[in-house]
Amino acid sequence: MRKAALLAGIFCLSPLAVAEVAESSANGFTTVNTVVVEADRMAAWQAAVQVGRWWNSAHTMSGDAARMAIEPRVQGCFCESLGDEAGVVHLTVTSVMPGTSLRLSGGLGPLGLMGVYGNMTWDFEEVEGGTRIRFKYAVGGHMDGGLDQIAGPVDAVLAEALGRLRLYIDTGNPEPAVID
């Protein structure tokens, strides 16, 4: 419970993406997040795989999103460099269809330290005025207290990430505008 409360305090939900914990139980959860961007599918895809340009540095181990990278090829790495020869594999690319979908497997961030496994799919669908991007992350396994305790915080991180990707694609800047 304390772990879930800590994660909830760290993560915030962005209004820039439609987010949903589609399913949640002690043994797993599924989150679905969607946005529509003002770009064609290939441009949206190319921006998405440049994760270091739009991911939030607050949700990295290094504190610097520029150290995040995705190798968009089968068995490619969604990795983070920690300097020198240190680093972490957050997810492994398992399916690549440029402009259409990217599938990754593993435990993103702190989930990689738990007894869980996940499958994340990024889908790119042409719609009127641009591209709909959908992040779906299904996680299963074991966590003391139940995985349902962290479904919301994980969903919030992914919603924020997708909102930042939307801003990056639409404006060139992933940072939300600050209104004084």
Q: Where in the sequence are the language-model features?
A:
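Hydrophobic ligand-binding cavity/cleft-lining segments
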Residues: 18-69
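Glycine-rich portal/gate segments that line the openings of hydrophobic small-molecule binding cavities
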Residues: 53, 57, 63-109, 171
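N-terminal signal peptide c-region/cleavage motif recognized by signal peptidases
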Residues: 14-16
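Positively charged n-region of N-terminal signal peptides that target proteins for export
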Residues: 1-4
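Hydrophobic/aromatic beta-strand elements that line small-molecule binding cavities or substrate pockets
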Residues: 33-35, 89-95, 118-126
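Hydrophobic pocket/interface hotspot
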Residues: 44-47, 78, 93, 104, ...
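Short, highly charged C-terminal tails/helix-capping segments
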Residues: 167-180
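Beta-strand/loop substructures that line and gate deep hydrophobic ligand-binding cavities in soluble
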Residues: 109-160
